[in-house]
Structures are given as structure tokens and as C-alpha cells.
């Protein structure tokens, strides 16, 4: 059974978040949470919160046991970019 959780509008670059995602791919949930807790990256709390959400979805919606869960697939795609403009005279 596949359980899904999505995080949108994260404030960390996808290239940096992929480094954290690669650390927990294929690991059991407890091991992945321990890795994220001690990883000194800005994306670690975001990925940790996402993992907790996926575990909560599995337990609540599908009545699965947390001990049996592992990270089958995790990926990071690029989201929307903010265009920042400083209105000034350009001439």
C-alpha cells in the first residue's frame, strides 16, 4: 500500500532538498526520522515534517503499523519562482 504526502511552497532550494531526500530513501521510518533529526541542513525540518505527515496518513487512513513502514519513494521537484522586482527609473 502506497501512502502519499505532499509539501508545497517550501522555502529551500530543490537542489539542497534533494541532498536530504537522498539520505532517507529506502530506509525504515524510525531510522529516517533519526537521520533527519541529526542532519544539519535547512531542508531537514521540512522533510521531517513531511515524513511525519505521511506516517500519520498511513496510521489514520489505512490502519498500518508505524514499525512496518519504510520510505519507498521520495522526490523533490522545482516549484514556482518568485519574481522580485524593484520598481525604479531605468534611464
Swiss-Prot record:
CDD domains: Ribosomal_L22
GO cellular component entries: cytosolic large ribosomal subunit
Keyword RNA-binding belongs to the record: yes
Coiled-coil residue spans: none
Pfam families according to UniProt: Ribosomal_L22
Family annotation (Gene3D superfamilies): Ribosomal protein L22/L17 (3.90.470.10)
Keywords, sorted A to Z: Ribonucleoprotein, Ribosomal protein, RNA-binding, rRNA-binding
Superkingdom as given in the UniProt entry: Bacteria
Biological process, per Gene Ontology: translation
Any GO MF annotation of the entry: rRNA binding
Record note on quaternary structure: Part of the 50S ribosomal subunit.
Family, as annotated: Belongs to the universal ribosomal protein uL22 family.
Task of the protein: This protein binds specifically to 23S rRNA; its binding is stimulated by other ribosomal proteins, e.g. L4, L17, and L20. It is important during the early stages of 50S assembly. It makes multiple contacts with different domains of the 23S rRNA in the assembled 50S subunit and ribosome.
Name of protein: Large ribosomal subunit protein uL22
Organism placement in taxonomy: Bacteria, Bacillati, Mycoplasmatota, Mollicutes, Acholeplasmatales
Gene field: rplV
